[in-house]
A protein has these predicted regions:
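Aromatic-lined ligand-binding clefts that engage carbohydrates, nucleic acids, or primary amines
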Residues: 617-642, 669-673
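Short, conserved beta-strand segments of beta-strand-rich sandwich/propeller modules, principally
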Residues: 583, 666-668
Length: 703
């Protein structure tokens, strides 16, 4: 993706700018690469680097505020006038269209359309947040402003580069559009635009609800209801005015609408994207809150939106400012791997790394939402290994279907987080199903709800999710025919009681295991992801018959697996190292290999190193396998054994198989470490390794 960022000196959208973009596209075309164009000069999208507002100042991001009629400026844009009654504490009591006769407790207020004062991040140092020349954000709730935005950006790109569209150029990326803009002054205001009141009414609002958004309200229920209706109104208008306009343009020009909305839980907007997407930045999700953060739903929502709309791809813009809090350049290869596996476990199949910088030679560049996750970081020489890993797991998640035990109903108003946490921990698969998809895409067939390729026998509805009579009626049609619906905030007890699984993982300490059962090209696959720091061992139990193989996502190599046949099906012994994945595929045309009874178990002897860069150890002739292991590495270790390169360690588990390089008698190990780029661009962090151990395996080691 070509992303104009802070520090770009060439004038945005100038002829020189397009010459540079064309050069990039020609280079990509020669290499058979695909390119996504970015629709803004930084972000959020929608203003064309301020050009929309420069052409018509009325198209700046708008807001509604309440002003006493007697204080309303003569040039103010008054949209509505209400008579408001406040109690002695200044809280809203009543709203009238006309002054009640004989009651002077009502005061006339004008509801005035004004401006948010919001901006976007621009390209020059004086155009960043809070800077005097930050470009003005546009009123993206106004379809005329959005049309002007596409004229300045999309039409210009097509005018200059149309020969690449639908070939090298596959999409336009829109980035977290904001109705208020950044750094907006929203005290006593709400985002608004012309003719939005009709939408507000259609979403269930009344005059009292509108007033409750601008005045303190004693009744908390009224305040919550008003906020809910307002959020629904804004979402609806944003979808119609902004996303639909961009979607129509992209389809008319043979490219996909890509990017992501501003909120992690904005699932209703995702249906407008040809490639539903989200972003994982600013450590919104970490290893500690992977199942509990409100933002943890993002990747699953995008993947499930693609599943239900029939889109083959879904994306995630990831890694931006995901390093150590306060020291973002301290972002290790293992950190990157954890985030990748988090995304793959939830169905993501298009990774958009944030970001690759051509240069970090100045503080403006090196401090622009670090770290660089490409050419200016320590793993660049190994990036092909990382890219191939991404490619293989993206392939696995593309044009495959998962096997959900249940659908979890959701909307942009509420996406259940806590109720699904035990489902993840217990290995039950679910898909988020939006109310919009339930009502407009799903069919009730006998006792099931069917959406595209997915058939749901069980529907889980969080008791905190607002639903109306029409939704209840459609669910009821399924239930009266034998379908299962559970309305509660406790999902796991119901699922364990009512769902019978034929494929699952059985082991100890599996809370950090994510179990994914996929079907692709007629073959069953199992993606087992360890999101924790402790090795997980156990058994994959399945009724799937065929020749099983362990698929190495780093190399593409496969190795056959043997199963034990029991009354539960076929059982495969599996070990998933920390922060790692295990991919098991089954060829239904092959035959199951059964494990032999009484296979000898190798004994283990460990030799601890001194924690320095070199160590020696003695190896007997009866040793059959030798592994090198570290407790921790900061950040990349290059290993030599007996003077020969043994490999490079970037990720957990910090281990290497060095069997082929060892010899009977004395052996030497040399370790050199490359430290974090935080030591160059951020705050100093440790460089080195911990807990070096040589593990010797053999039949007679216990003797």
């Amino acid at each position: 993706m070509i992303h104009p960022r802070l520090g770009l000196e060439t004038e945005y959208l100038s002829d020189e700018y397009f010459e540079l973009v064309e050069a990039c596209l020609e280079a990509a075309e020669r290499r058979h690469m695909m390119v996504v164009l970015y629709d803004e000069a930084m972000y959020p999208s929608g203003s064309a680097h301020g050009r929309v507002v420069a052409e018509d100042k009325r198209f700046a991001a708008r807001a509604l505020t309440a002003v006493r009629t007697e204080e309303t400026p003569a040039d103010a844009e008054v949209l509505y006038r209400f008579w408001i009654k406040l109690n002695s504490g200044g809280q809203l009591e009543d709203v009238r269209l006309d002054q009640p006769k004989g009651d002077e407790s009502y005061v006339s207020y004008d509801f005035v359309l004004t401006y948010t004062g919001g901006t976007i991040r621009g390209l020059l140092p004086d155009e960043d947040d809070g800077q005097p020349n930050a470009p003005a954000a546009a009123d993206i709730l106004n379809p005329y402003a959005v049309q002007l935005f596409t004229q300045h950006t999309h039409d210009r790109y097509y005018e200059k580069l149309s020969r690449f569209f639908g070939k090298t150029v596959i999409g336009f990326f829109t980035d977290e559009p904001s109705v208020s803009g950044r750094c907006a002054d929203m005290k006593g205001k709400i985002s608004w635009t012309y003719d939005l009141l009709e939408d507000f009414f259609e979403c269930g609002g009344e005059f009292t609800d509108l007033a409750a958004l601008l005045f303190p309200t004693k009744d908390k229920k009224t305040a919550r209801n008003a906020a809910r209706i307002y959020k629904k109104t804004i979402s609806r208008r944003l979808n119609d005015a902004y996303y639909q306009t961009l979607s129509d343009w992209c389809r008319a020009h043979n490219v996909a609408l890509m990017g992501h909305p501003a909120e992690s839980g904005d699932c209703d907007t995702l249906r407008k994207f040809d490639v539903p997407g989200q972003d994982l930045v600013w450590r919104m999700v970490t290893e500690e809150n992977a199942l509990t953060s409100p933002d943890s739903v993002m990747a699953k929502l995008a993947a499930d939106s693609a599943r239900h709309t029939g889109a083959s791809r879904n994306s995630n813009e990831c890694f931006g400012v995901c390093g150590e809090a306060g020291n973002p350049w301290n972002f290790t290869p293992d950190n990157m791997m954890w985030y990748l596996n988090f995304l793959f476990a939830r169905g993501c199949n298009m990774i958009i790394p944030h970001a690759f910088y051509y240069s970090v030679r100045t503080p403006v560049q090196s401090n622009e939402r670090p770290p660089d996750v490409g050419p200016n970081n320590i793993w660049w020489k190994d990036y092909r290994k990382i890219a191939m890993y991404i490619k293989r797991l993206s392939w696995l998640n593309t044009t495959s279907v998962n096997h959900p035990d249940a659908a979890v109903l959701c909307s942009s108003e509420h996406v259940p987080v806590k109720p699904v946490e035990p489902l993840y921990k217990k290995g039950y698969t679910f898909n988020y199903l939006t109310i919009d998809d339930l009502m407009n895409r799903a069919r009730v067939v006998d006792d099931t709800i069917r959406v595209d390729q997915y058939i749901y026998k069980v529907l889980l509805v969080d008791s905190r999710l607002p639903i109306d009579a029409a939704i209840v009626e459609k669910i009821g049609r399924c239930v009266i025919q034998g379908g299962l619906m559970h309305n509660s905030s406790n999902f796991i007890d119901y699922v364990e009681k009512n769902v019978k699984r034929t494929s699952y993982f059985e082991g100890e300490n599996t809370d950090d295991l994510r179990f994914v059962h996929l079907s692709k090209s007629g073959c069953p696959f199992f993606l087992l992801v360890n999101e924790g720091r402790t090795e997980i061992t156990g058994k994959l139990v399945t009724d799937q018959n065929g020749a099983a193989a362990d698929f190495d996502a780093f190399t593409g190599n496969t190795s056959p697996m043997a199963a034990e046949m029991t009354g539960r099906g076929f059982e495969y012994k599996v070990t998933i190292p920390p922060h790692s994945v295990k991919v098991i595929g089954i060829n239904p045309k092959g035959f199951v290999t059964l494990a032999k009874d009484g296979e000898p178990e190798l004994h283990l002897r460990e030799i601890a190193g001194l924690g320095e860069g070199n160590m020696t150890f003695t190896c007997r002739e009866d040793i059959t396998k030798v592994r090198l292991a570290f407790t921790d590495i900061h950040d990349i270790a290059d290993v030599k054994v007996n003077g020969k390169d043994a490999g490079r360690i970037l990720f957990m588990p910090y281990e290497l198989d060095i069997t082929e390089l060892t010899q009977p008698g004395e052996n030497t190990v040399e370790v050199s470490v490359t430290g974090s780029m935080a030591n160059t661009y951020g705050k100093p962090v440790p460089v080195g390794f911990e807990g070096l151990t040589v593990r010797l395996y053999g039949d007679a080691l216990s003797q």
